[in-house]
Amino acid sequence: YGLNLFNDYKNQDKFQLQSRRYIGNKAKLTDWIMEIIESETEGNGTFIDIFSGTSIVAKSAMEKYKTVILNDILYSNNITYQAFYGTLKWNSNKLVELANEYNTLNSKSIRENYFSKNFGGKFYEKEISKQIGYIRQDIEKKKKNNELNSREYAILLTSLIYTIDRLANTVGHAYIKKPITKRPLNFKLIQTSDFKGAKIYQEDANELVRNIKGDIAYIDPPYNSRQYSRFYHIYENLVQWKKPKLFGVALKPEPENMSKYCTVQAKDTFKD
């Protein structure tokens, strides 16, 4: 499919932070949350979002606070923080050219790959899954060849996550067993932030809080039994790109990054 070709980043249609689907997303509650915080507290120093998720609350805090600490155990969330809030300079023209290249891919000429073999015809339409796998491998190859710096790498991976989010044939963490509607990939870049005061972590929240300081701590842990690392296993797989062996109907890798906040240990974990 040849779609949405642009000459520059400024005039390109871009993904906004809130464009991604995510369980527990606070997009509709953010204004209310920040109003309460501002009415009950003073100062504009350091804001800590210890379970950042999509980082929608952290982004809102950036309008007031000089420093915002973001933390999440998921690789697919951490890479989005580096993409949106990283401070390393990046070449927008280079990424626009790559986005255009990805939008003109002919899936018929792309070989089967790890992504299409595992997720094609299940989570994603077969031809789309070949494109996704090709793009992911191309991003990795360019990074290893030093054609991308770490910020450009993060922006491309995050843009890929946002691009495929609405194409997924899923209900929760598994796929819907019915024919998949064919839709174009339509690769778009994200709208990066100009905020320079972000500090980004990927650590166990209970350990991290012992080593950081701030004025406001916003604590919004997982609150259901579904592990986020299992719910978003495709994105975790896509970002890490270790190409693990997958198991079960939902095609998940071996468990990792399991949160005690999603278990009967939640109460004791909070006390800690």
Language-model segments: residues:
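Conserved proline-anchored active-site loop of SAM-dependent methyltransferases
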Residues: I33, F47-A61, L70-L74, G214-F231
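Class I S-adenosyl-L-methionine-dependent methyltransferase module
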Residues: T67-I69, I73-T192, S225, S229-K271
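Conserved SAM/SAH-binding loop
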Residues: Q202-E207
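General small-molecule cofactor/ligand-binding pocket signal
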Residues: I69, K199-Y201
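Glycine-rich phosphate-binding loop signature in dinucleotide/nucleotide-binding domains
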Residues: E40-G43, N145, N211-D215
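A short helix-to-beta-strand connector/capping loop
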Residues: Q191-K199
